[in-house]
Amino acid sequence: MSTLAVVGAGPKGIAIAAKARALAAAGLPAPRVVLVDRGEVAGNWTGRQGYTSGLLPLGTPPEKDIGYPYAPSWGDASAGVVAAMAEYSWQRHLIMHGAYSDWVDRGRMRPTHRQWSLYLREVAAAAGAEIVRGAATSLDIGDGGRWEVRLETGDMIVADGVVITGAGPSVTVPGQPRDHPMVQDGRTYWLAAHELRRDRALTVCVVGSGETAASVVIDLVKHCHKHSTIDVLTARGVLYSRGESYEENRLYSDPGEWPRLAESHRREFLERTDRGVFSLQAEAVLNQARGFRTLAGRAAEIEAREHDVILTIAYGDERQRVAYDAVVVAIGYDARWFEGLLGENAGVRYRAALGDGELARVIDVDLSVSGLVPPLHLPVMAGLAQGPGFPNLSCLGLLSDRILRRYVADNKARALTAKRSEHA
């Protein structure tokens, strides 16, 4: 049996573990799936590790759960796999808690992040997910050609494939201090928000134009002193919103036609629907807010002083230094953080597979880096090449199908070889 190591015990990791359990229940030779995480299961959704207060609404409909879109992807075994995955559905979770009819009658409200984390933890437990505690400190390829995942605990997991999930560290601005109460990022803001919810008016600048920034801005609008001033710094000086339509949503759920689109059109689609846009719900809140404005430019430098924070704003050839009481840098997370974990052998093979190309362009159908053996699966980088739903929560069931298929095929081939050897 092959082993698949997943760095991160969040939605993607849990979806893969649950699907492996469903495949095994349907009689398919699923791999052993090991989830590696330094914190608790679904910890980034609880509010205890930053990234959210835990009370923010889920950005996607909860029906797009661990098994969505429940596609018949496994031939004759498909019905059994889909039925097994239905046991891990959001609706099943509500039914077991006696909350299904209430949820329907209230208009299928989106759960909070904390409620979503409880669902994820229940799925992980029900699926019997194997979870190893500890941070991954090194990913290298051993003499046997398999991955060696080393942990801070000193343990090592040997695996036939590795999946990288979860947000990387926050992207920073030059001069941004690591530990200053009035300079925060998209993760730490939620751990220090009380510093900005004071009884006096503050001037705050939020740097960013995506959903991370939107969540921070809405929280500030709701909880800061009513006379506070909140600036949002974006490259274009305008907050664009994303409307939803069947045609857009279809490509998130079923990206079969996605690779056939011209790359320029795929990039435009991602720009319009997934990157640098506020949701309509966020825009509705901000449309009613006072003391809120947008500025054009980029954050060129931060200077944190004792009583204020100086933000240098660059726009074209102009540079302006503006003093704020606080600055929140919410420009996203480093999706390529895993590169710092790659050991010598893995680094050489990874760079050879990448060549002079852009990483986002060389992600294969199974969400791995094309040409890299053993496979390294990077769903967060798969949006451009394979479909817009893979980096987020829009098609977790399809994501797990894509990744697990090669390991099921490998296990079948090994079993067939072993059987032939017995009869030789």
What do these predicted ranges mean?
Residues G39-A79, L239-G256:
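Conserved N-terminal glycine-rich FAD pyrophosphate-binding loop of Rossmann-like flavoproteins
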Residues M1-E40, W45, D102-E211, S215-A424:
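Flavin (primarily FAD) cofactor-binding/catalytic cores of flavoenzymes
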